[in-house]
């Protein structure tokens, strides 16, 4: 029943003019250089207008601009992506609790190359999503440098979702 009430409230907000989802690229920086990552394609957000400019800000200015955009568009759900969003760890440590207090459900998509703060587990409405490219051999072949073991260490103790890009090589692999 709790989930149904939440769904009804979300639909009410959408019908009243709120955006269902807002995806924010808060940085293009990333310590990895994974093949196929859109973050390094110069034109990947050419049509997005003001959203692309968020990646140009840091510190309190980034926090203020994200909050202003969220207040203006009133989304039900915010997805925070990058590059690697954890590059802006300090800003996220301020931003995530504020978005939660505003009643915004947030999805943070990360490679988990940095340890996830334990305190984030207590933030209501926050879903951590970790990008993994298959099991260890496949993942480490695609990532530069190999990160599978590091991810396991960095996500330990967290409840999260996994985002996996399925490639042609995975599908065609013998025994799949």
Where are these regions (language model features)?
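Conserved alpha-helical substructure of the radical SAM core
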Residues: 2-119
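Aromatic/hydrophobic pocket-lining residues that form the small-molecule binding cavity
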Residues: 59-63, 92, 148-151, 173-175
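Structural detector of well-ordered beta-strand residues that form the stable sheet scaffold
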Residues: 107-109, 129, 161-163
